[in-house]
Design a protein with these regions (language model features):
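Active-site-proximal alpha-helix that buttresses catalytic centers in soluble enzyme cores
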Residues: 2-72
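Generic beta-sheet signal
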Residues: 3, 137-143
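Short active-site segment of divalent metal-dependent hydrolases/proteases
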Residues: 11, 147-148
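Generic structural signal for well-ordered alpha-helical scaffold segments
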Residues: 34-41, 119, 123-131, 152
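Short beta-strand scaffold positions
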Residues: 50-51, 120, 142-143
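Active-site signature of alpha/beta-hydrolase-fold catalytic machinery across serine-
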Residues: 62, 150-154
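Phosphate-handling substructures
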Residues: 67-124
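Acidic, low-complexity terminal tails and accessory targeting/binding regions
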Residues: 69-73, 79-92, 131, 135-137, ...
Length: 203
C-alpha cells in the first residue's frame, strides 16, 4: 500500500479570532493546489482523505474532482495548531515571532502543544488508513507539515518531531508492506510548485 501525503497549499493569515483559526487558501495557494492533480497523475489513487481544516480540504478539492472521488475527512490528520486562535504562516513568523520560529526550525513543536497527544492522534489515524487499504491501493492524504513530520519521525526513529522542511503542496510518499514495514520513498517533492513557493516568489 502506498500513502501519498500532500501538505496543504498556502493559506491566508488570520490574526485573532474567537475560537480556533481555520484559514482557507490564499490566491497563490489556489494556484498551487491546481498543480497537484497533474503531479499525481501517474498514480492509481483509490481513496482521497483529508484533515478537517479548511486549508487541507481546499487543497484536496482539485485532486478529488479530477479523480471523481469524494474527500473523506479524518479528524486525526488535523495539524497541531487546530485549536489556536491565530494562524501565522511560517514565512511571517520568521520575522514577527522569531523565538517560536527558531524553535520550530530546530525541530521542535511549539511550546504550547501537547506533543505525545499529537503524535498518538496522527499515528492512530495513519494506522487506520493502512489497515483499511488493500495492499495494492494508493491513498492520498491532504494534511500538514507537522502531520507529515510526525510520521517520518516514527518511521525513521528520529529524535525531533519536525526534522524535515515540508513545502506547500509538496508530496511525500510512504510505502507499507503486507508485513507492516514502512518505508519513506520520497520526502517533500516540490518541483510541480517550485516557482510558486514563497521563497521563490519573493526571490
Amino acid at each position: 500500500m502506498q500513502l501519498i501525503l500532500v501538505r496543504h497549499a498556502q493559506p491566508v493569515r488570520i490574526e485573532q479570532v474567537e475560537g480556533a483559526a481555520d484559514p482557507g487558501l490564499a490566491g497563490v495557494g489556489v494556484e498551487q493546489a491546481e498543480r497537484v492533480p497533474a503531479a499525481l497523475g501517474h498514480h492509481r489513487i483509490a481513496r482521497v482523505v483529508s484533515s478537517p481544516q479548511r486549508r487541507a480540504l481546499e487543497t484536496a478539492g482539485p485532486t478529488a474532482a479530477k479523480l471523481g472521488l469524494e474527500v473523506e475527512v479524518l479528524d486525526g490528520l488535523a495539524e497541531y495548531d487546530r485549536d489556536l486562535p491565530a494562524y501565522i504562516p511560517i514565512e511571517d513568523a520568521k520575522v514577527e515571532f522569531r523565538a517560536e520560529y527558531d524553535r520550530i526550525k530546530a525541530g521542535h513543536l511549539p511550546s504550547v502543544i501537547d506533543e505525545p497527544a499529537f503524535r498518538s492522534r496522527v499515528l492512530d489515524a495513519i494506522t487506520d488508513i493502512a489497515v483499511r487499504a488493500d495492499h495494492t491501493d494508493t491513498v492520498v492524504a491532504f494534511a500538514h507539515g507537522g502531520v507529515v513530520n510526525i510520521l517520518l519521525q516514527d518511521i525513521l526513529g528520529l529524535a525531533r518531531p519536525l526534522t524535515f522542511p515540508i513545502d506547500y503542496c509538496s508530496i511525500t510518499r510512504v510505502l507499507f508492506s503486507r508485513t507492516g514495514r514502512r518505508t519513506a520513498a520520497t520526502i517533500n517533492e516540490n518541483g510541480h510548485v517550485w516557482e510558486l513557493l514563497p521563497r521563490n516568489i519573493s526571490a
